[in-house]
Amino acid sequence: LDWIVPQEWLIKDAYILDPMGKKIADFTKNNLHLVNYSCAIDKTISLTELKKHLHTLPLMPNDVPYVTSYYNRTWGFCISHNEFENLKEGKYKVFIDSNHIDGSLVYGELALPGKTKKEILITSYLCHPKMANHELGGPVALCYLYKMLKASGPHKYTYRFLICPENIGAAAFLHKSGKDVGNVIEAGFILNCLAYGNEWVLKKSREGNL
């Protein structure tokens, strides 16, 4: 694989001050307000310029969206569309105290041995902040599934569990372990968006045979 793990992102604080000096989009109160991976900035700009860096959900006007920019060095904030519509003309101070360093990518891996070396790979993501459905629901279900399978085993297959950052985490795992697990994996499942209260669904592979 020729993917490159992005630099580690360190964030301390971020906010916007409106023309009256009121703090909005305060990262310390809701970390969804900041576009993940935003570059540092400390600048006073016009409302027109600010709007180029604001993200909203017009169809869900009370909600704050989650936005990332891992491969495009920029900055931005996320606010509700209702708040966006009520912004007044004037000068806005934007402040982001962040840094990008050569750090590390961490993922969790655990194998539950079976009667054969053939494996079932079960993965979930752990990279989105503050969200129960498109984040925490998957890892929680994965942990309970491991506990259930361990208590009812041994099983025919070896079950390998992986919790990692979405996309780049899976690429890092395959880069490190792909040659070892590629020949033994019989099937794989990604547990995602399991906490939204509706019926669970199974999404097939691109070929439609899994």
At which residue positions do the language-model features occur?
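N-terminal hydrophobic/helix-forming segments and targeting peptides
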Residues: 1-210
